[in-house]
A protein has these predicted regions:
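Pol beta-like nucleotidyltransferase catalytic core
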Residues: 1-49, 53, 59-161, 168-267
Length: 267
C-alpha cells in the first residue's frame, strides 16, 4: 500500500485516505507547498501541481528552477513536462451526466472570483450578456451561492467555457461537463484539446474577445442548425463517450497510472 505524508495541506481531502503517518512514506508537496521541499530529501519527494500557472505562478517558477528537488513532478504544465522526471496528471472530473432534451440555446456561468486574467474575462463576457437575450447568464459564488451545473448545461445546446489558463492540456470540469451533458462548448482553453477530444464538437476560439462574434453567427443562423448538424451530432456522441474515464476520481486515476512508479520509491 502506498503511504504519503502531505506537507502544508492546502486543499482538504487530497490524499487524505492515503496519508497515514509512516516512516516509509512519500513526501507530497503540492501547489504552493513546493516551497518547503528540501534538495537533500529529493529521493523521497514528489511535487503535484494541480492549479494552473495563472493561479500559482511562483510555485511553477520554483519547481522550474529546482526540478532536482523532486524525484517526480506531476503536472499538466507543458513547460515542466519537458523535464525528464515530470509526468502528466489532469485533475479534471465529470460532475454531471445527462442526455436530456435540448430546449435552450446558449448559457454561461461565472463566479465572482477575479484572481486571474481569465476569471476577469469570464466575468466581463457574463456582464456583457446579462441584459441581452442571446445568452442566459448564471452568476454564482463558489463559497456562498454556488450554481448547479445542471442549471446551465442540462437543457442547453451551447455553453461558453473559459478555462482559468491557456496551456496545451489544461482542461477541467468546465469542458468535461459539457461533453457529459451533450452541450457544445464555446471554448477558450487547452490549445491541444483536439488531441484528446473530437474538435468537431467544440467551438474553439483563440481569444475570449472572439466569443461575441461567434455568438452572433450562431444566433443569426440558428442554434438548431449548428447543434443538429450531422457532423456535429456525431462529434457530440463521440465526446460523450470520450469523457467517460473522467467520471473516475482524479486521485484514483493518479494511483492507477502512477501507483507502481511510486511503489518503487518506497522499495
Amino acid at each position: 500500500m502506498l503511504h504519503f505524508k502531505e506537507h502544508h495541506r492546502l486543499y482538504s481531502g487530497f490524499f487524505q485516505e492515503l496519508c497515514p503517518e509512516s516512516d516509509n512514506a512519500i513526501d507530497v508537496y503540492y501547489d504552493q507547498a513546493v516551497w518547503y521541499a528540501k534538495k537533500e530529501n529529493a529521493k523521497n519527494q514528489i511535487a503535484i501541481l494541480l492549479e494552473p500557472r495563472s493561479m500559482i505562478k511562483d510555485a511553477y517558477l520554483y519547481v522550474g528552477a529546482h526540478p532536482d528537488y523532486f524525484k517526480y513532478i506531476f503536472t499538466h504544465d507543458s513547460f515542466l513536462l519537458s523535464f525528464d522526471n515530470a509526468h502528466e496528471v489532469n485533475w479534471g472530473n465529470v460532475w454531471l451526466t445527462t442526455d436530456s432534451e435540448k430546449t435552450k440555446d446558449i448559457s454561461i456561468c461565472t463566479s465572482s472570483k477575479d484572481w486571474c486574467p481569465l476569471h476577469k474575462a469570464r466575468i466581463e463576457i457574463a456582464n456583457y450578456y446579462k441584459n441581452r437575450s442571446e445568452v442566459d447568464v448564471f452568476f454564482g459564488d463558489w463559497n456562498t451561492k454556488p450554481v448547479e451545473a445542471k442549471d446551465y448545461l442540462e437543457h442547453y445546446k451551447f455553453s461558453i467555457v473559459i478555462e482559468n489558463d491557456i496551456d496545451d492540456f489544461w482542461y477541467t470540469e468546465k469542458i468535461l461537463n459539457c461533453f457529459a451533458t451533450k452541450t457544445i462548448p464555446i471554448y477558450v482553453g487547452a490549445t491541444k484539446i483536439s488531441e484528446r477530444f473530437n474538435p468537431s464538437g467544440i467551438c474553439q476560439v483563440k481569444d475570449w474577445n472572439e466569443i461575441p462574434a461567434l455568438i452572433d453567427i450562431i444566433v443569426r443562423l440558428g442554434a438548431d442548425s449548428f447543434y443538429y448538424n450531422p457532423i456535429m451530432q456525431e462529434a457530440i456522441e463521440d465526446n460523450f463517450y470520450r469523457c467517460v474515464p473522467y467520471k473516475i476520481s482524479w486521485k484514483d486515476r493518479f494511483i492507477h497510472d502512477y501507483g507502481q512508479l511510486l511503489e518503487k520509491m518506497m522499495s
